[in-house]
């Protein structure tokens, strides 16, 4: 098995009407917890790391872990650069073996976003690396980046059409009412806007900020063309809450093998639910056209 591009995973999801879950990773334990479930449920998966992730643990170390797990779990893995903002940073990581990258220029004006994304697409496509970009801007907290409500804005369908045509990007993250992190009130998802984007854009669409969104809302977005669902905050909360509870019950405890496993098991329950919501169970493809 190997580290692969997300392009083929998302094309299969688009053709068959499901979504591939993209789970944010932080260390060996989070990777292992995710893959234990995905292997058991035979679900394709995208392991996403933000720039902050790669400051915590070097790309080369994460890549080595993912390569080893791909063999031991007998499944191809997509290691994805989530919310990266620099061509130079992406270039270095693609040269190290990564085959999936998100370039986030959503904070720039439209034309500047296009220019940045096009430069990344031109480089990545020469290296069999798929590219995701974002148009519109989600509010909330992602990594060490905070976007307030006044700075967030939704994706315009006609701009999305033009953006995809100008950049040649492989997948598009859209802003339709979700936000990074947890919600203080029930989110208002603009399903009509999503449908209008789907009508004019033929590449896979991506839902960011899916943590804490009602399952029925996520399923509806998949029906309307979302092929990749990002989950981060719910995983961290489940892991951390379980570890805190373990220490409350075992105040003298000090063995990471015990409390890490408790955290991993709690995270696994979230992963199972998200796979069921995405409809990706038993969708793992091992065909040579997918595994590069």
Curated annotation (Swiss-Prot):
Highest rank taxon of the organism: Bacteria
EC code: 4.1.2.40
GO term, biological process aspect, one: D-tagatose 6-phosphate catabolic process
Pfam families: F_bP_aldolase
Sites where the protein binds dihydroxyacetone phosphate: 181, 209-211, 230-233
Keyword vocabulary terms for this entry: Lyase, Metal-binding, Zinc
Claim: Zinc is one of the keywords in the record: yes
Active-site residue numbers: 82 (proton donor)
GO cellular component: cytosol
SUPFAM superfamilies: Aldolase
Cofactor note (record): Binds 1 zinc ion per subunit.
Binding site for Zn(2+): 83, 180, 208
Reported function: Catalytic subunit of the tagatose-1,6-bisphosphate aldolase KbaYZ, which catalyzes the reversible aldol condensation of dihydroxyacetone phosphate (DHAP or glycerone-phosphate) with glyceraldehyde 3-phosphate (G3P) to produce tagatose 1,6-bisphosphate (TBP). Requires KbaZ subunit for full activity and stability.
Complexes and interactors: Homotetramer. Forms a complex with KbaZ.
PANTHER family per record: D-TAGATOSE-1,6-BISPHOSPHATE ALDOLASE, D-TAGATOSE-1,6-BISPHOSPHATE ALDOLASE SUBUNIT GATY-RELATED
Family (UniProt): Belongs to the class II fructose-bisphosphate aldolase family. TagBP aldolase KbaY subfamily.
Protein name: D-tagatose-1,6-bisphosphate aldolase subunit KbaY
Lineage: Bacteria, Pseudomonadati, Pseudomonadota, Gammaproteobacteria, Enterobacterales
């Amino acid at each position: 098995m190997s580290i692969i591009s997300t392009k083929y995973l998302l094309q299969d999801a688009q053709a068959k009407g499901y979504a591939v879950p993209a789970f944010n990773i932080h260390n060996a334990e989070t990777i292992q917890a995710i893959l234990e479930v995905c292997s058991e449920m035979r679900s394709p998966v995208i392991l996403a790391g933000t720039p902050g992730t790669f400051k915590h643990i070097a790309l080369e170390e994460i890549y080595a872990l993912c390569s080893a797990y791909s063999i031991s779990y007998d499944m191809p893995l997509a290691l994805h650069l989530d919310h990266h903002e620099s061509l130079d940073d992406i270039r270095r990581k693609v040269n190290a073996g990564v085959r999936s990258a998100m370039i986030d220029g959503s904070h720039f004006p439209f034309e500047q976003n296009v220019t940045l994304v096009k430069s990344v697409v031109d480089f990545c496509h020469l290296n069999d690396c798929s590219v995701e970009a974002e148009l519109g801007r989600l509010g909330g907290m992602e990594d060490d980046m905070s976007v307030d409500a006044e700075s967030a804005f939704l994706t315009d369908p006609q701009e999305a059409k033009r953006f995809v045509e100008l950049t040649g990007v492989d997948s598009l993250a859209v802003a339709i009412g979700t936000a990074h992190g947890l919600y203080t009130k029930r989110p208002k998802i603009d399903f009509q806007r999503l449908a209008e984007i789907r009508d004019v854009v033929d590449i896979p669409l991506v839902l960011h900020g899916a943590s804490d969104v009602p399952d029925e809302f996520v399923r509806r977005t998949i029906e309307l063309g979302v092929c990749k669902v990002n989950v981060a905050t719910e995983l961290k909360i489940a892991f951390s809450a379980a570890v805190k509870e373990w220490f409350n019950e075992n105040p003298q405890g000090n063995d990471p093998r015990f409390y890490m496993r408790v955290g991993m098991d709690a995270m696994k329950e979230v992963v199972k639910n998200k796979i069921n919501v995405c409809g990706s169970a038993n969708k793992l493809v091992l065909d040579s056209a997918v595994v590069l």
